[in-house]
Regions:
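General nucleic-acid-binding
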Residues: 1-20
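Short, Lys/Arg-enriched anionic-surface-contact patches
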Residues: 27-46
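Short, amphipathic alpha-helical "recognition" segments used to contact nucleic acids or chromatin
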Residues: 45-57
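Short alpha-helical "recognition helix" segments of helix-turn-helix
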Residues: 63-65
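Short, solvent-exposed alpha-helical "recognition" segments
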Residues: 79-91
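Conserved small/polar residues in nucleotide/adenosyl-binding loops
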Residues: 94-101
Length: 106
């Protein structure tokens, strides 16, 4: 496991096990609506889009304009893409496109 060992604990395991049971987008909306604030969910969604745009080669100013993300957020995501645990890979736009049609993503 390449994740930070400080993150691993029974409560986080329980959270992830719960997430892994979700089967539909609607179930995800319902779960995350109850679990997160709107801002927390928007922030996570924004970071995923920043990662997608960085993978596509977009520059910081374009990403900032398109997503509203700060340069600090963009830098953090870029650092995760380069030096992180590859956590964005399974949910990256490129990976999702290999498994779904674009109309399924929008």
């Amino acid at each position: 496991m390449s994740v930070n060992h400080r993150l691993v604990n029974p409560l986080t395991d329980q959270l992830f096990d719960g997430i892994l049971t979700l089967k539909t987008r609607e179930e995800c909306y319902e779960f995350f609506e109850d679990l997160c604030t709107i801002n927390e969910l928007r922030d996570m969604s924004q970071r995923l889009e920043v990662a997608r745009m960085l993978e596509a080669g977009d520059k910081y100013d374009r990403i900032e304009e398109a997503t509203g993300a700060s340069t600090a957020t963009i830098s953090r995501v870029k650092r995760c893409l380069k030096f992180g645990a590859d956590g964005y890979v399974p949910v990256s736009y490129t990976h999702l496109r290999a498994h779904e049609t674009l109309s399924d993503l929008v």
